[in-house]
Regions:
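Cys/His-rich short segments
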Residues: 87-153, 166, 277
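Gly/charged, well-structured mid-domain segments that form the phosphate/adenylate-handling core
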Residues: 133, 144-149, 182-224
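Glycine/charged-rich beta-loop-alpha catalytic/anionic-binding loops adjacent to active sites
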Residues: 91, 156-165, 211-217
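A conserved segment at the C-terminal end of the G1
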Residues: 1
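Active-site beta-alpha connecting loops in nucleotide-dependent enzymes
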Residues: 203, 221-300
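Flexible active-site lid/hinge loop adjacent to a nucleotide/diphosphate
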Residues: 4-6, 10-116
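A conserved, hydrophobic alpha-helical segment in the catalytic core
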Residues: 24-34, 123-137, 164-198
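A short acidic, amphipathic alpha-helical/loop segment
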Residues: 19-24, 71, 196, 232-236, ...
Length: 301
């Protein structure tokens, strides 16, 4: 009847809609995992979305931000905040060649940034030798990712804790670190969080594995016409062990009636990751299959 019947709400808000929602809903905490480019017809450049959020986030909202994201880490500078992040791992492949790097220059003085390490795109740690700008330190820090045991170690404001790794990608680890940071700020203990995390699984609509005969079939979803999302999946395919055949089904069902979408996103996407000796075959499907073939040929596949 127009009255709140719960004490707590967890809301996922569309960035574009935030300007309409935040005047009426003032979150206690706001978690932003990252800001990247989206499809051309929707959000396009990350700075466009940054400006919308930066102007409309309520002053009293405490932010939980990714210290490794040089875009979202700068949101609403006057607000109270904590940061989460992932330390550089000993066996981690960094600074992979990529088309999109949205923060090559210092956001404060415009000089070229020096990256201490770049995990992918603009995710990593950087500093400016001219004005002193640098990536913030993480309050909630993933210090160790143990792929063999499927566990991660985190420093929760200086206190060490061990958690199950939910998912296998670095994106999954960032999502988990962000969730742990928010819940820690709410006052949940590491032991409470451990018990809850043990029950978590990645939904199969996003990622699934199935054994068919002697073949391991992996399905991974990327956001439609999104160059960063597709590039991350391509990188994951490249880094997966063993010989691989890749089937690209990149058509967006939402565009089924209008298949003449802007194809420029294909040339922002790192198809070069598929130019790898471990990939023995690439199959393209859908109405844009010939466009994908041309892009693959340009990538040397």
């Amino acid at each position: 009847r127009g009255k709140t019947v719960k004490d707590l709400a967890v809301l996922e808000l569309d960035e574009r809609s935030s300007r309409l929602i935040y005047p009426y809903v003032h979150p206690t905490y706001l978690l932003c995992t990252n800001l990247f480019r989206d499809s051309y017809k929707r959000n396009a450049h990350s700075e466009f979305i940054f400006d919308i959020l930066d102007k409309h986030i309520p002053k009293q909202t405490k932010l939980v931000l990714n210290a490794d994201d040089l875009v979202s880490a700068r949101l609403a500078k006057g607000n109270d905040r904590v940061y989460f992040g992932i330390e550089k791992q000993d066996n981690e492949v960094l600074n992979e060649n990529t088309i999109i790097i949205d923060t090559p220059l210092c956001p404060e003085c415009g000089s070229r940034l020096e990256y201490d390490f770049r995990r992918y795109h603009h995710i990593g740690s950087a500093h400016c030798t001219k004005c002193g700008f640098r990536s913030p330190k993480a309050d909630y820090d993933v210090t160790k990712v143990n792929e063999s045991t499927g566990r991660i170690t985190m420093s929760l404001k200086g206190k060490q804790a061990d958690f199950k790794a939910v998912g296998t990608s670095v994106t999954d680890t960032y999502n988990l670190a962000g969730a742990i940071a928010v819940l820690s700020e709410f006052g949940l203990s590491a032991e409470q969080l451990k018990k809850s995390v043990e029950k978590l699984e990645i939904v199969k609509s996003r990622y699934d594995e199935e054994k068919i005969g002697d073949k391991q079939v992996i399905m991974s979803v990327a956001k439609g016409q999104n160059p960063v999302a597709c590039s991350r999946v391509f990188s994951s395919i490249k880094n997966h062990t063993g010989k691989k055949a890749v089937v690209l089904m990149l058509d967006d069902l939402g565009d089924a009636e209008e298949t003449s979408e802007n194809t420029a996103w294909i040339y922002d996407t790192d198809f070069e990751f598929l130019n790898d000796d471990s990939i023995t075959q690439v199959i393209c499907s859908g109405v844009r299959r010939t466009d994908y073939k041309v892009r693959l040929l340009l990538a040397g596949v």
